Each structure stands twice: as structure tokens, then as C-alpha cells.
Amino acid sequence: MCRGRVLLVDDHEAFLAVEARLLEPEFEVVTTARDGRAVLEEAARLAPDILLLDISMPVLDGIQAARLLKASGCQAKIIFMTVHGDQDYVQAGLAAGALGYVVKSRLATDLLPALREVLAGRSFVSPSISMA
């Protein structure tokens, strides 16, 4: 079975380490980046299957980065992982081209299911987020 290739983007080193540990049994983390501008370069260079993006980052936030990536023709599927659990952020993330949205407080339970669903072409939003 081929492991999905993931580009992991978060400006917090501690979160990067936790996220990578959660992913590595099932997915290949091809590299990490610390801001939205760096992900533009790394995505073009590495062509990952999935981009895991934080929203609040320096230089260029995740939503702006996702819009630019999609406009440039990037084929990677995008999942946002963020502390922002309100509907406005979820809707902005999905409108920017993401298929997935995971709140960081639920990474341990939601991250791998989100990647599996998105890799299969389906959407995923952390069940703890009310979309009513």
C-alpha cells in the first residue's frame, strides 16, 4: 500500500512535532514548513498528495496560501488544522479550496480520519464543530 505524501505546515515547532508523530505510522511527511510563503515553494517542488496547513501563520496565513496554491494549479488536497473552531473559519477554509478542517484540540482523534477521508476525495470537518 502506498503511503500518502504530506507537506506539514505550522508555525509552532511543538505542534509540528506532535503532528508528524501522529502521521508517520500511516503517511510520509515529505517536509515541514513554518509559514504560508514557504508552503508555496515546497508544494511546487515536492508535489505532495496532501497539504496540512495551519491557518494563523506569519508572512502569509493558511487561507491565503490555499487560495494561491489552488490558483496556481496545485493538485494537492488541503486540510486545515487550527485552533479556530468557529463556523466562519471553517467556511473560509472550505471556500479557499480545502476538503478538510481539524481543530487542534482534536488532533489525536480527528487527524488520521481526516487524512483518510480527504485522500479518498471526501470532505472532513472535526465533528466537534457545529455547522448548524
Where are the regions that the model predicts?
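Acidic, metal-coordinating helix/loop segments flanking the phosphotransfer/catalytic sites
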Residues: 32-50
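Two-component/phosphorelay signaling modules centered on CheY-like receiver
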Residues: 13-31
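Receiver (REC) domain active-site loop signature in two-component systems and cognate sites
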Residues: 57
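Short, flexible helix-to-coil linker/hinge segments that flank and couple to helix-turn-helix
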Residues: 88-95, 99-132
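Acidic catalytic/metal-coordinating carboxylates
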Residues: 35-38, 60-64
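Short amphipathic alpha-helix used as the core "switch/output" element in two-component signaling
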Residues: 41, 63-74
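Short, conserved "switch-loop" micro-motifs in signal-transduction and mechanochemical regulators
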Residues: 84-85
